[in-house]
Amino acid sequence: MSMQDTLADMFTRIRNAQMAEKETVRMPSSKMKVAVANVLKEEGFITDYKASEEAKPVLEITLKYYQGAPVIENISRASRPGLRQYKAANDLPTVNGGLGIAIVSTSKGVMTDRAARKAGVGGEVICTVF
Protein backbone atom coordinates (compact mmCIF):
# COMPACT_ATOMS: atom_id res chain seq x y z
CA MET A 1 0.00 0.00 0.00
CA SER A 2 1.39 3.40 -0.94
CA MET A 3 1.67 6.27 1.50
CA GLN A 4 -0.37 9.29 0.42
CA ASP A 5 0.86 11.96 2.83
CA THR A 6 4.39 11.18 4.00
CA LEU A 7 4.77 14.42 5.99
CA ALA A 8 1.61 13.72 8.01
CA ASP A 9 3.11 10.28 8.72
CA MET A 10 6.34 11.96 9.89
CA PHE A 11 4.46 14.26 12.28
CA THR A 12 2.40 11.35 13.63
CA ARG A 13 5.55 9.30 14.26
CA ILE A 14 7.11 12.22 16.14
CA ARG A 15 3.95 12.73 18.26
CA ASN A 16 3.66 9.02 19.06
CA ALA A 17 7.35 8.67 19.94
CA GLN A 18 7.17 11.64 22.29
CA MET A 19 4.06 10.29 24.02
CA ALA A 20 5.94 7.01 24.52
CA GLU A 21 8.99 9.00 25.75
CA LYS A 22 11.29 7.51 23.11
CA GLU A 23 14.73 9.00 22.60
CA THR A 24 14.76 8.61 18.81
CA VAL A 25 12.30 7.93 16.01
CA ARG A 26 13.12 6.37 12.62
CA MET A 27 11.18 6.78 9.39
CA PRO A 28 11.65 6.57 5.62
CA SER A 29 13.56 9.61 4.40
CA SER A 30 12.89 12.17 1.66
CA LYS A 31 14.34 15.57 0.77
CA MET A 32 11.29 17.34 2.18
CA LYS A 33 11.41 15.42 5.48
CA VAL A 34 15.12 16.24 5.86
CA ALA A 35 14.39 19.93 5.16
CA VAL A 36 11.60 19.97 7.78
CA ALA A 37 13.87 18.18 10.30
CA ASN A 38 16.57 20.79 9.63
CA VAL A 39 14.14 23.63 10.44
CA LEU A 40 13.00 21.82 13.61
CA LYS A 41 16.64 21.45 14.71
CA GLU A 42 17.49 25.11 13.94
CA GLU A 43 14.49 26.24 16.00
CA GLY A 44 15.39 23.95 18.94
CA PHE A 45 12.43 21.57 18.76
CA ILE A 46 14.61 18.46 18.22
CA THR A 47 18.14 17.63 19.34
CA ASP A 48 19.50 16.21 16.08
CA TYR A 49 18.68 14.24 12.97
CA LYS A 50 20.58 11.85 10.70
CA ALA A 51 19.66 10.95 7.14
CA SER A 52 21.29 7.73 5.96
CA GLU A 53 21.86 7.07 2.27
CA GLU A 54 21.24 3.34 2.15
CA ALA A 55 19.24 1.34 -0.39
CA LYS A 56 16.17 2.49 1.56
CA PRO A 57 16.98 5.95 2.96
CA VAL A 58 16.16 6.32 6.66
CA LEU A 59 15.74 9.52 8.67
CA GLU A 60 16.48 9.21 12.39
CA ILE A 61 15.35 12.10 14.60
CA THR A 62 16.62 12.52 18.17
CA LEU A 63 13.78 14.02 20.19
CA LYS A 64 14.20 16.76 22.77
CA TYR A 65 12.67 16.89 26.25
CA TYR A 66 12.70 19.61 28.92
CA GLN A 67 12.25 18.51 32.54
CA GLY A 68 10.77 15.23 31.32
CA ALA A 69 8.17 16.86 29.06
CA PRO A 70 8.40 16.89 25.25
CA VAL A 71 9.56 20.21 23.78
CA ILE A 72 7.07 19.84 20.92
CA GLU A 73 3.65 20.32 22.51
CA ASN A 74 1.77 20.18 19.21
CA ILE A 75 2.81 19.48 15.63
CA SER A 76 0.06 19.44 13.04
CA ARG A 77 -0.19 19.39 9.28
CA ALA A 78 -1.59 22.60 7.76
CA SER A 79 -1.49 22.05 4.00
CA ARG A 80 -2.47 18.55 2.93
CA PRO A 81 -2.82 16.78 -0.42
CA GLY A 82 -6.60 17.33 -0.51
CA LEU A 83 -6.44 20.99 0.49
CA ARG A 84 -3.22 22.86 -0.19
CA GLN A 85 -2.67 26.11 1.74
CA TYR A 86 -0.62 28.77 -0.02
CA LYS A 87 -0.07 32.11 1.70
CA ALA A 88 1.58 35.38 0.71
CA ALA A 89 4.41 36.67 2.92
CA ASN A 90 2.15 39.09 4.81
CA ASP A 91 -0.61 36.45 5.24
CA LEU A 92 1.58 33.79 6.90
CA PRO A 93 0.10 32.66 10.24
CA THR A 94 1.61 33.45 13.63
CA VAL A 95 1.49 30.35 15.79
CA ASN A 96 0.56 30.52 19.47
CA GLY A 97 1.13 34.26 19.72
CA GLY A 98 4.60 34.00 18.17
CA LEU A 99 5.80 31.25 20.54
CA GLY A 100 5.46 28.56 17.88
CA ILE A 101 6.47 28.36 14.24
CA ALA A 102 4.85 27.60 10.93
CA ILE A 103 7.11 25.73 8.50
CA VAL A 104 6.73 27.08 4.97
CA SER A 105 7.94 25.67 1.65
CA THR A 106 8.98 28.67 -0.45
CA SER A 107 10.81 29.24 -3.72
CA LYS A 108 13.89 29.92 -1.57
CA GLY A 109 13.62 26.63 0.34
CA VAL A 110 11.91 25.36 3.47
CA MET A 111 11.94 27.92 6.30
CA THR A 112 9.99 29.26 9.25
CA ASP A 113 7.20 31.80 8.92
CA ARG A 114 9.43 34.48 10.46
CA ALA A 115 12.24 33.86 7.96
CA ALA A 116 9.76 33.86 5.06
CA ARG A 117 8.26 37.17 6.20
CA LYS A 118 11.74 38.66 6.55
CA ALA A 119 12.69 37.43 3.06
CA GLY A 120 9.36 38.69 1.70
CA VAL A 121 8.34 35.35 0.21
CA GLY A 122 5.20 33.30 0.65
CA GLY A 123 4.59 29.65 -0.06
CA GLU A 124 2.88 26.48 1.06
CA VAL A 125 2.30 26.28 4.82
CA ILE A 126 3.45 22.73 5.60
CA CYS A 127 2.77 22.55 9.34
CA THR A 128 2.56 24.42 12.63
CA VAL A 129 4.69 23.56 15.67
CA PHE A 130 4.60 24.80 19.26
Curated annotation (Swiss-Prot):
Signal peptide: none annotated. It comes from Hahella chejuensis (strain KCTC 2396). PROSITE patterns: RIBOSOMAL_S8. Part of the 30S ribosomal subunit. Contacts proteins S5 and S12. One of the primary rRNA binding proteins, it binds directly to 16S rRNA central domain where it helps coordinate assembly of the platform of the 30S subunit. Pfam families: Ribosomal_S8. GO terms for molecular function: rRNA binding; structural constituent of ribosome. The gene is rpsH. One of its GO terms (cellular component) is ribosome. Keywords: Ribonucleoprotein, Ribosomal protein, RNA-binding, rRNA-binding. InterPro entries: Ribosomal_uS8, Ribosomal_uS8_CS, Ribosomal_uS8_sf. This is Small ribosomal subunit protein uS8. Belongs to the universal ribosomal protein uS8 family. PANTHER family: 40S RIBOSOMAL PROTEIN S15A. One of its GO terms (biological process) is translation. The lineage of its organism: Bacteria, Pseudomonadati, Pseudomonadota, Gammaproteobacteria, Oceanospirillales.
